[in-house]
Amino acid sequence: MADPTAEPVAGQSSLIRPAYSRVLLKLGGEMFGGGQVGLDPDVVAQVARQIAEVVRSGAQVAVVIGGGNFFRGAQLQQRGMDRARSDYMGMLGTVMNSLALQDFLQKEGIDTRVQTAITMGQVAEPYIPLRAVRHLEKGRVVIFGAGMGLPYFSTDTTAAQRALEIGADVVLMAKAVDGVFTADPRVDPDAELLIAISHREVIDRGLKVADATAFSLCMDNGMPILVFNLLVDGNIARAVAGEKIGTLVTT
């Protein structure tokens, strides 16, 4: 947990009092497209503003972004493409999203580094955990692109693994719904929001929040996950401040 007396980054003020000192924020790529293929600059700018507010509060923020606004390997496989090749295409999509978010964060005055699991030295650093931690300690945002660098692994699993390796306090899983429900709220009007639940229960009940590999990894290593609605402005700050939003998943 964060020291409540911690000074905001670069002398900038913030009304947030972070409950977590280091967080891993998982963003779905579909949100970056505003429901379309490609990037919606207005959406990326809005997310960057929210992250900047959190960084100014003194919290350390790392980010993993999906690539679903460009490619989804599993869906391309269903159309006849080789799964491994389509997954690599999806990884490149995550890098495009990462560079876009980096650009908008820099415009907010937040120093940002992109680290990729696939080497592409002209646009990003290679993924080096100790270097990532050092960037975070200096108040920089670190965005992890290209997933795990391996096919068959989702960006949800990447988020869980990166959170564990950099010593994050929590995975903040941003979604287009308010949290974990007993059923899909877009299909079942009687679905109820769960305020708290265990990793095991999510897996056993087959609740579609993230893939089972990500939840198993977090469960085995005691990593909490907060599932919340990114579409509500200011929710990233509320999540970092420890406010009662979304669903907290613990062991």
Curated annotation (Swiss-Prot):
Keyword Nucleotide-binding: yes
Record-level GO cellular component terms: cytoplasm
Subcellular location(s) of the protein: Cytoplasm
Gene Ontology MF terms in the entry: ATP binding; UMP kinase activity
Biochemical pathway: Pyrimidine metabolism; CTP biosynthesis via de novo pathway; UDP from UMP (UMPK route): step 1/1
Principal location listed in the UniProt entry: cytoplasm
Residues reported to bind ATP: K26, L27, G28, G29, G68, R72, F181, D184
Keywords, comma-separated and alphabetical: ATP-binding, Cytoplasm, Kinase, Nucleotide-binding, Pyrimidine biosynthesis, Transferase
Binding site for UMP: G67, D87, M148, G149, L150, P151, Y152, F153, S154, T155
Gene3D superfamilies, per database record: Acetylglutamate kinase-like (3.40.1160.10)
Reactions catalysed, as given in the entry: UMP + ATP = UDP + ADP
Enzyme class, broadest EC rank: transferase
GO biological process: 'de novo' CTP biosynthetic process; UDP biosynthetic process
InterPro entries, sorted: AceGlu_kinase-like_sf, Asp/Glu/Uridylate_kinase, Uridylate_kinase, Uridylate_kinase_bac
PANTHER family named in the record: URIDYLATE KINASE, URIDYLATE KINASE PUMPKIN, CHLOROPLASTIC
Subunit text: Homohexamer.
Family assignment from sequence similarity: Belongs to the UMP kinase family.
Biological role stated in the UniProt entry: Catalyzes the reversible phosphorylation of UMP to UDP.
Listed name of the protein: Uridylate kinase
Origin species: Mycolicibacterium vanbaalenii (strain DSM 7251 / JCM 13017 / BCRC 16820 / KCTC 9966 / NRRL B-24157 / PYR-1) (Mycobacterium vanbaalenii)
Gene from which the chain derives: pyrH
